[in-house]
C-alpha cells in the first residue's frame, strides 16, 4: 500500500529542481513558475508549469520542446525513474 501512495520527495531533490526552475524562469523571462515534485517507490513525478507573458523569450512549440529536453537532461543524474510533465500557459488558472 505504501508504494501506491505519493510522498514528498527528498528535500535535497526538491531544492535542486526548484533552483533549476527558478534559473530557467529568469533566463526565459517567465512571469512565474509552479513546481510539484512527489515520489512513489522508485518513481519521481515532476510537474512544472511556466506562466509566460509577452516578454517571455519562448513562443514556438519547438523552443518549448528544446527547453523540456534541457530540463530532462539537467535531471539525468537523479537516480529515480522520472516522469516529467512541463506545461506552458499564459493563464495561471491552468497551472493551479
Where are the regions a protein language model picked out?
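Alpha-helical transmembrane segments and adjacent TM-loop junctions that form the membrane-embedded core
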Residues: 1-96
Amino acid at each position: 500500500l505504501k508504494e501506491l501512495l505519493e510522498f514528498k520527495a527528498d528535500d535535497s531533490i526538491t531544492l535542486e529542481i526548484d533552483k533549476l526552475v527558478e534559473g530557467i524562469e529568469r533566463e526565459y523571462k517567465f512571469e512565474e513558475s509552479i513546481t510539484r515534485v512527489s515520489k512513489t517507490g522508485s518513481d519521481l513525478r515532476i510537474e512544472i508549469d511556466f506562466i509566460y507573458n509577452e516578454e517571455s523569450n519562448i513562443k514556438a512549440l519547438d523552443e518549448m520542446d528544446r527547453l523540456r529536453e534541457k530540463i530532462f537532461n539537467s535531471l539525468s543524474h537523479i537516480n529515480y525513474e522520472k516522469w516529467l510533465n512541463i506545461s506552458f500557459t499564459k493563464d495561471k488558472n491552468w497551472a493551479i
